[in-house]
């Protein structure tokens, strides 16, 4: 089967895409040093291409050279696969694959059948072979990494003739290693990383866009947030990346200026939605009086950026906002427990959450305790009412329980460090995965993802494992970047506990402790991938994907510093994702002006 799209059958919700003939005036304002667009769309030029037009063009281009479609496609389905896989990869890289989910699923089903037959159209081309492996594994198909074993050893690859784009595809495939025993992918990752780094060092990639793409992948592959990856790919997009002859003819016609304009405008629509959500979060923050607190981290913009970066669909606005609200609330209360509040005040917040009842102002003990409790109380009560509608049942008790659990861990950690209690690494990790906040943020926001979540699902071992693995990744990577600061504050984490446990071994260094912590994080990341990619589990894939997205946040924040507390790279990324719209390609803009 060839990849063909039916314009009439492809759903475009009002939230997902507007008519491409709409042209909104652009108004710029400045918010804390950032330019902001206040209109409903950030289209800087009028593009004479409607959604229906684009779907028609896609259907037309994908038919190929034989007008007797799809009959001709049924004759040689394997021959279409290289171009189909390149198209799927491009739709994903440019962030518009959500419009074609059913079509993509159909193609991957066909691809898997060809994979099982070891069809030459897939296996004879190294780049297509690697791409098929990656797309199928991520989708949940059982594909053995041993199929890539011929490329695992650098000695079996002609490094003088192999193209950089092909090595990139091998590198991307190697990132999907889920098992400890997948030695082929481990070897593949090692030599492709070395090869690409050497290409950068010797400045031997003449294509500037390809050079930047290699830099981007090598910088922090596990920490590429979905929408940041889309932004980067839109900036660096080049059809010549796909050089397989079968793909090139058909594919180059589709990926024209119109298609790129569609993807860029879709990005701008999502960006405008993220700006609107930031304004909502800022109003909520002020309504909760959290802006009056004189201590701790104000992470409203950070929370908005992180949620916008991992959850792109415009219709999932509630998911993003609820997730961001809980990042803010958890951070504020964590800072209170760690630095601002007295032990008694911290205990008081937990008692209030357990009782779940508003009090006269005098009974809170301090204004800060009142602000923090009422912020949680009012926010969760409102969310519980809305979640009741979404879920068709009351989930209020479950949501409150999540808050009781995380604050109980905050209290336990406060007591441990305040009393200088001896702690083993296992003791620490058994609780600290909860206090990192991933679990509460994910399960709170997931109530609004559009899927009914039963108690059986939420209380299942699978849910616990998903929460624990993603939280362990974020906790361990956070510990690696913050252990020096926490040691000065007389608190501990996994790195300091590893050092303490090996204090009698003079050869055990900080570097060794960091290496072990990173290995533990990587092990949990792979275990998380195994659960997410596995089919037939209690959680639908859309829910499980949320955990993998949050895992990328941890890899993004703590790759080389603490971007959450001291954002540097994040500030630049925030500008490009939330504040700076993409312009239509100059050629398209010129064509439009000439009409």
UniProtKB/Swiss-Prot annotation:
InterPro entries: Isoprenoid_synthase_dom_sf, Terpene_synth_N, Terpene_synth_N_sf, Terpene_synthase-like, Terpene_synthase_metal-bd, Terpenoid_cyclase/PrenylTrfase. One of its GO terms (molecular function) is terpene synthase activity. GO terms for biological process: gibberellin biosynthetic process. Residues 1-47 form a transit peptide. Mg(2+) 3 binds at residues 478, 486. Its cofactor is Mg(2+). It comes from the Eukaryota. Mg(2+) 1 binds at residues 334, 338. Pathway: Secondary metabolite biosynthesis; terpenoid biosynthesis. Its EC number is 4.2.3.131. The keyword Flavoprotein does not apply. Induction: Induced by jasmonate (MeJA) in roots. Keywords: Chloroplast, Lyase, Magnesium, Metal-binding, Plastid, Transit peptide. Mg(2+) 2 binds at residues 334, 338. The keyword Magnesium applies. Involved in tanshinone biosynthesis in hairy roots. Catalyzes the conversion of copalyl diphosphate (CPP) to miltiradiene. The Asp-Asp-Xaa-Xaa-Asp/Glu (DDXXD/E) motif is important for the catalytic activity, presumably through binding to Mg(2+). This is Miltiradiene synthase KSL1, chloroplastic. The lineage of its organism: Eukaryota, Viridiplantae, Streptophyta, Embryophyta, Tracheophyta.
